[in-house]
Amino acid sequence: TNVLKRVFARHPDVYALPFEVRFLLDPGGIIDFYTSFSTSWSPFLADDRIQRLQTLLTDVEREQLVHRLPDWLALRCGRGRWVAPRRYAGWELARHLPHFRAHNRRLLRALVEFRYDGAWPGTASYTVAPEVAFAPPQAPNELRELLSNYLTTLFEELLQNTNHRVLFLDETWALLFMRELHELLPRARFIHMLRDPRDVIASFSQQRWCPRDRVEATHFYLELMDRILAHRQDLGSRYYEVRLETLVADPRLTITNICEFLGLAFIEELLEVDLSQPHSGRWRSEFNTHEQQTINALVKEKLLQLGYPSENESVEN
């Protein structure tokens, strides 16, 4: 749920982008590049990773006018399940992040020593005028410093440009990469909004990137949570958990505690977001009898671990 972003977007010290940035955590993005480039290297591997990073950064920079109609149609065909829209349709980060394109070019220049005409046996089929980017290996600490400076500059310029102090990012997979994000952005803090696993599964099954089958969506959810919970202690005081149900039951106390965690002053405007429809317990009406029995059995241990009631217990905040 992005309810916390809606809450804290009302704070005068907080800036919240209206979308996920995508270039940070998606395949071929900054974290993917960071975790792979220094662990294994060959000229071909390096070129492939550079090309993927460059393609992703270009795709999210700005949408061309010619793409808007087909993208609009694709997104309305089963919400993109029938026909996938163009990659990153609608993303135009250059409109929001100051000098985004210039910083991207500067980053790529720092990574690539030179380019030359050439092709690998595995170069994409029928590439016109193929080119190879030669990117020499970098020590992990050198790569970390380079990428950290890139991200820090991007985000600090955004905050200066908008006259805010704190940037609130709502990234779907951020909690899976807390350690890596902390290495590149050591001042970052992470908030994990917990929710009844069965309600999360009900929500997941309606997303175009998740299985529609709710039992499959349960396995999807459990793998995510196992990884997140295994690493939550690594962040120490920079990681904070809060239940959606607790936020709804006592918003003032919950938001005050989050403000303290973020180093923000509490203001009354944060309570103006409507929290009356959290869809708590939605799984009871959306799951059929077989799904309820199967999924309750699958998430039994996770319910206990997270402190949520089992099938026949009532919810306690």
Residue ranges and their predicted role:
Residues Q138-E180:
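Conserved helicase/translocase P-loop NTPase motor core
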Residues T1-D13, E180-L185, D196, E241-F266, ...:
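PAPS/PAP-binding and catalytic site of the sulfotransferase fold
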Residues F19, L169-T172, L244:
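Short His-Asn-centered micro-motif
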Residues T35-L65:
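Conserved nucleotide-sensing/catalytic segment adjacent to the nucleotide-binding pocket
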Residues D71-W72, G78-E145, S205-R208, M225-E241, ...:
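PAPS-dependent sulfotransferases, especially Golgi type II membrane carbohydrate sulfotransferases
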Residues Y15-P43:
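Conserved substrate/cofactor phosphate-moiety recognition/catalytic segment
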Residues I191, D199-E223:
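A glycine- and Lys/Arg-enriched "phosphate-lid" helix/loop adjacent to the NTP-binding pocket
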